[in-house]
């Protein structure tokens, strides 16, 4: 086993206060495309730039165009948790992992069995009326046709954070609390270029910061351990 992975395993074995902060790279091994890589959503050609489509203004003005993109690109069928999701759920059951803080919207951490999951950007598995806030099952939104409407006449929207929208203060504050109190902070599958989410790791006060990502990140120099490898491969060895 790689000496760096051995070090990470030792940190986890000796701790009962581990927090995991993850991004799109955690789910790519389950077949969900990321956003910013060469093959990611943001580097593909559409009628409008994906960053524009995934904005509050665009959703409000052109909900039909939004939902075409949503159903074609954001909804991925028959995906299952991978080795990273499963190991994190196992570590939580063992009393070692205190929380998963994720930028992902796919619900795979919960599907793997994780209980304490702080979804910074919401979930594609939930939806609600943009007018009266009545909650709705995601099926109508993800698999229907046209623009889904509430019984009040309002447009049903996904429970995700679009561009131009703030993060949920309650979730952010809980994430800050978990990160600031963590003994070991593992950051995985994220380029750490998305703010304000990436800025949350600045609240970590410990000396066991591990970065697991295929490519380099702006925080590599601040980490105590950097592993440039697929996160599923790393977690399958822990």
Give the positions of each predicted feature:
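Conserved catalytic core of sirtuin-type NAD+-dependent deacylases
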Residues: 1-238
